[in-house]
Amino acid sequence: MNQKNSLGLNKCFLDKIDPIDLFEVWMNEAKKTELNDPNALALATSDQNNFPSIRMVLLKDFNKDGFVFYTNLNSQKGNELKNNPKASMCFHWKSLLRQVRINGMVQKVSNKVADEYYSSRGYESRIGAWASKQSTVINNRDELLNSIEEYKKKYSNKNDVPRPEHWSGWNLIPTSIEFWLDGESRIHERLKYTKDTEGNWVKSLLSP
């Protein structure tokens, strides 16, 4: 690969492009090529003993202020984020041979934002937020299914299912964003944006 003639991240390094703008371009392209869930990401958190855990979640919104996902606040990831608000995200779009890694600090979204997103979910999903005590042990599958039916009876009006207090969103405020582009003979392209002490993005090309 001739890095000087690259039309990928080398060009982005030379141009004055904001990492959020670049992410939006890549996400929009992934929506056209990925068969399933282009907004899927691996979310890494860690417990009080610094032992990491990782799982797939879905990105539901992003802008200059951060990257938003929703979850049960009492789940493993919810509890870990309460105790240690540092987290990492990794997007991998196999169809485009691209990857994005994002590190940062999380904070809960406002009740207004959480309410608006929750109300946009389907009835079954809203009921599930009540019925599932995420990450806790259950005796069998029927226990969960019975809980779902109980909440369906309680909230039979599909237009009136309130958001549980234990269900909300987290906004990851990025401190660094790295873009990775596959290259021939494993000579990949890596472009990293890091926020300086004044909140400005500083770009660096990394060796593959």
UniProtKB/Swiss-Prot annotation:
Binding positions for FMN per the UniProt entry: R55, M56, V57, L58, L59, K60, Y70, T71, K77, Q99, Q134, S135, W180, R190
Task: Give cofactor(s), names only.
Answer: FMN
Top enzyme class, one word, equals: oxidoreductase
Keyword Oxidoreductase present in the record's keywords: the answer is yes
**Which reaction does this enzyme catalyse, per its entry?**
pyridoxamine 5'-phosphate + O2 + H2O = pyridoxal 5'-phosphate + H2O2 + NH4(+); pyridoxine 5'-phosphate + O2 = pyridoxal 5'-phosphate + H2O2
Q: What is its EC number?
A: 1.4.3.5
The biological processes this protein is annotated with in GO are: pyridoxine biosynthetic process
Cross-referenced NCBIfam families: pdxH, PRK05679.1
Q: How does it assemble?
A: Homodimer.
> Per the similarity annotation, which family is this?
Belongs to the pyridoxamine 5'-phosphate oxidase family.
> PANTHER family annotated for this entry?
PYRIDOXINE-5'-PHOSPHATE OXIDASE, PYRIDOXINE-5-PHOSPHATE OXIDASE
Protein name per UniProt: Pyridoxine/pyridoxamine 5'-phosphate oxidase
Query: Which organism encodes this protein?
Result: Pelagibacter ubique (strain HTCC1062)
Whichever gene encodes this chain, its name is pdxH
